[in-house]
Amino acid sequence: MDIPLVMTIIGKDRTGLVESLAGIVAEHGGNWLESRMCRLGGEFAGILRVHVPAERQPELMRALKALESRGLSVVACADESPAPVATGRLTLLEIVGHDRPGIIREITRVLAGQGVNVEELSSECVSAPMSGETLFKARVRLQLPARCDSAGLREELEKIASDLVVDISLADLDAEPVPARR
């Protein structure tokens, strides 16, 4: 029987890092299922889901622990629970504005208050084309519960968007985005 494992990985970015990890998983009969990995600053960070034969799991865990000597921290845990059945609507939230502390905090406060689940979040700071000022950009994939009113959520987000001086758009993933006012 295969055991599903979810891992987090962090360490100084270097060539061959992912290959080392993939090699260890393969050497222990593991199957690499899905991952999200990137360089953040000078660090490499990732999340990974694998299946490994139950009898090879302890051996794999020891091999992953040995990566610490090469400056890579790996935390692995068994993912015994079944994946939750998705309910509600998938929605994409995009945020763009001048960078400042608290943008994600304020946006996620509204989302949590409406019972919205953040399924995926990616963000970055980039230089504005003309001014060179720092812009904050985020893309957030949301799972809206059936009880969540999209219009009400949009209204709440628009209220804080003007305070945060950001533009937001909220779109059903199956429909065209409707830009929010700033």
Label each PLM-derived region with a short phrase.
Residues 1-182:
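A conserved regulatory-domain signal marking ACT and ACT-like small-molecule sensing domains
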